[in-house]
Regions:
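C-terminal structural segments of small proteins and small subunits
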Residues: 67-95
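Short secondary-structure junctions
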Residues: 25-32, 43-46, 86-91
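A short, structured beta-strand/loop element
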Residues: 38-60
Length: 101
């Protein structure tokens, strides 16, 4: 599993911005899979999902993929969309990688 912290600039509500961009069709490669107690998104091509935890501070996301050797594809797609669509709203992206046992 991969965990991410996305720090916004100037109080940007990144969770709402991501949901809006997906629902408006600006981000076509992802779809909202659930909106209950937070939300999660799925990539239309790559396996796995990204689960968001609602916090007042940074955006917290966990990338979950049953096939750990394919996690990088989901990570690459997500970080790429963040950098492309929200570069003016994001101060930093921190990525934590869990060890494989």
């Amino acid at each position: 599993m991969v965990h991410m912290q996305v720090l916004g600039r100037d109080g940007a509500n990144l969770q709402a911005a991501i949901k809006k961009a997906i629902s408006d069709g600006a981000i076509k490669s992802f779809e909202v899979a659930q909106v209950k107690g937070g939300f999660k998104i799925k990539h239309k091509k790559h396996l796995g999902e990204i689960r968001f935890t609602k916090t007042p501070g940074p955006l917290l996301a966990s990338l979950v993929c049953k096939n750990r050797s394919k996690e990088w594809q989901l990570l690459e797609a997500f970080v790429g969309r963040l950098a492309y669509h929200f570069k003016n709203d994001i101060a930093s992206i921190n990525i934590q990688l869990e060890r494989e046992d």
